[in-house]
């Protein structure tokens, strides 16, 4: 019996410009993914087939720059990073609900040579300068081992996002994994509308630590307007069209995944570790706990 099915279906969202700001269309992308899952699982012979989404992106054309398509501005800053974490988590929940063997998704990004810096193309670096979305993939790459259960009081219900996107309260959610002597937690604050907003105070509790562990080292990485974000540094420099050697080095450094604080020792009390930090809109935090 053949155990491989090639079923081609692009799953994409529809970002727009609303009242002068970018609004993402995550709902459309999720509806397309759900429908694709339903089609595959409607055939008994394919129901248990592993599924990889061959193209899963926020919109359908990587080559649209902000010059003619201002909605592409989301690609330059941390919004694309937050969207990436949000959509992957939502896809995983859809797969769980539909009893689908979801194995991964491909994000299509390209290189666009001889183009202005931060022109809004769907690319991971711009002229060799890493964009925030690449740091989102770096964070996701740190998640390995056994997945842990997560409960978030700030999460928007998955069925609500499927119906209307993230248009009311932001979705403040997390993914956590564990391997030997390490727990890694990715937390994000996502909203479809890229507008200024008050940061969310995150109170994070990790329970079930091994009884013998009394102290841990915590590393806290961050993507926001001021961390792991070369776009902000480029704007601080006056948006140079031809950066000097010194400016280019500064852009390279600002494009790397950065820590919010220096590594810290944290005590374990009663098998728990507690954290409290402000998480801006369209921002991500990665906490790596080792012992």
Predicted regions: what they are:
Residues 159, 185-187, 273-277:
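Generic recognition of long tandem-repeat/solenoid scaffolds
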Residues 1-103, 112, 116, 156-163:
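Noncatalytic carbohydrate-binding groove/subsite architecture in carbohydrate-active enzymes
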Residues 98-104, 108, 113-114, 120-182, ...:
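Glycan-recognition and catalytic regions of carbohydrate-active enzymes
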Residues 65-81, 86-109, 210-253, 260:
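Substrate-binding clefts and catalytic carboxylate motifs of secreted carbohydrate-active enzymes
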Residues 162-214, 220-238, 281-285:
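Carbohydrate-binding surface patches
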Residues 55, 109, 152, 187-189, ...:
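Active-site proximal loops enriched in glycine and acidic residues that flank catalytic Cys/His/Asp
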Residues 242-291:
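C-terminal beta-strand-rich structural cap/linker in extracellular carbohydrate-active enzymes
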Residues 55, 91, 105, 137, ...:
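Conserved, mostly hydrophobic/aromatic
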